[in-house]
Amino acid sequence: MSNSKYFQDELTYLRESGSEFAKYHPKLTHFLSEGTFDPDVERLLEGFAFLTGRIREKIDDELPELTQSLMTLLWPHYMRSIPSLCISELKPHTGSVTEKTVVKRGAEMASEQIEGTQCLFRTCYDVDLYPITITNIEQTNSRTSSTIDVTLSTEHGLELSRIGLDTLRLHLYGEIHITRTVFLWLFRYLDYVELDVGGGYKHRLGPEYVKPVGHEEDEALLPYSKNSFAGYRLLQEFFSLPDKFMFFDIKGLKWLKGIPQRSTVKVKFHFKRALPSEVVLKDKHLRLHCTPAVNLFQKDGDPIRLEHRRNEYKVRPQSNTQEHYEVYSIEQVESWSKDERRRKPLIEFESFEHQINQRDKREFYKSKVGERVSGRGLERYISFHTHNGDIADLGTETVLMKLQCSNADLAERLSVGDITYATHKSPTYATFKNITKPTQSVSPQVNGELQWQLIANMSLNYLSLANIDVLKVLLSTYDFHSRVDRQAHRASIHRLDGIVSSEIKPIDRVFRGVSVRGNQFKLVTNSKFFVNEGDMFLMATVLNEFIRLYSSVNSFTELEVFDEATGEVYNWASLIGQQTIL
């Protein structure tokens, strides 16, 4: 039972009504009247209160048997906790990297021990390592414009033309009021980028060579099924780790390959509008070789020895400290027969393969999610079925499982710089450390009204977003952190108050000589309800990606945002699917 309220209510009722009952049955006064408790009777009352509390909780749980099956089939990620997240920085070993070296996403890193357990994180972005460092950042402001000069120098004087520098990814790190503002200036007021290697060698890049990061499928923080729309993932990740989007790529750097004998380049960002006086970019605010990281890793499950007395079994990772782990997902299930001496794969019941070749005697598994008794985190249960849903008779076979796990709420106890230890899946030519504190692990409400809210979202179309209340409910539904963190909850409410109105209207555009009809989504906001104007712009950028869900294959969407506080109008290019068409 995850909610102690039910237990306390039942126990209080038994004690209070017990006194009244004892008045009519004097022989039981010694056991039931207040102030004179028999320890054995007290234990019986507590046990009875626990069981009846579970019954009440079951009555109030709003039919999770229906919602969980549907969610497992369509949106399995909402039956999983959001693991701890952070930003990690990699640094190549001196002399070990002399040209572009890619660290693929999924590289592993371990933390300091907490209660004897190391928390494992894996990277979410590919990281291009170069033998370069940021040696200086200068900012120049005038009344009408600003310039930020970033000086990059190679290690030991290596030539820029020889290190394979084609795309450079930078991370905006530090105070929110600075990073969000610079993000806004990069994608709203950037005039051009100039590469200066000295000696009169200069090259100009347009604003289209600076690209945002974090919207693509291969840049996801959380594993998502192919059945799920990536727009919902973006919303969930935005509320979980907004710094994930504080990255940008500078493309078009192949020009440097034609300039020999240069080891230093100045990357100059020229803006058409002056930065606010309180925004001063320093060396610490721009980082190279960074990536988000998530507390997820592969682990074997405890083998399950099947027995006829049980239909459902708890899924446990192999560990002596079960409380340090939480099962994120079941990746593989096999049964092993001692008599046949072979492994037989079991397929998830919701895969619908049970409807194929029904004559074959195949077994399937179902998983169920519930809250831990402690109320922190989720636990999973597994059962085995035939093709028609009946309980399968697997005899005395043993079930083996491969799991994807997190360290539950253990990882949130880590601090900046605690994730520095290598594993066999870590890069050998670089060191790493987390430059942000890992976030709190957050579990969804698996038994209750949230599941029905999520199912209701499936029926949304672009007309639904024209209702400002529906839009706010949609956004708050995916903000899991605001459900467990009071400060995050207040910030979420304040942010939603800054969304004033929404409107959708059909529009026509000409693309390659052909008239195409789409939908323009107009949003009125007030940046005073956000951290600053840049914070509002970041949320609108994520929303721009999200509304692609409501565009059919032969149509497009277009976002326009009006800020009441400043009078600024922001427009995003028309999108069809995942392609910019105008």
Language model features with spans:
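Short linear motifs embedded in intrinsically disordered, proline/glycine-rich low-complexity segments
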Residues: 1, 9, 13, 49-59, ...
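Extended assembly-interface regions of large multimeric machines
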Residues: 1-201, 205-214
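Short, aromatic- and glycine-rich surface loops/edge beta-strands on solvent-exposed regions
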Residues: 107-110, 262-272, 397-404
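Short, low-complexity Pro/Thr/Gly
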Residues: 155-361
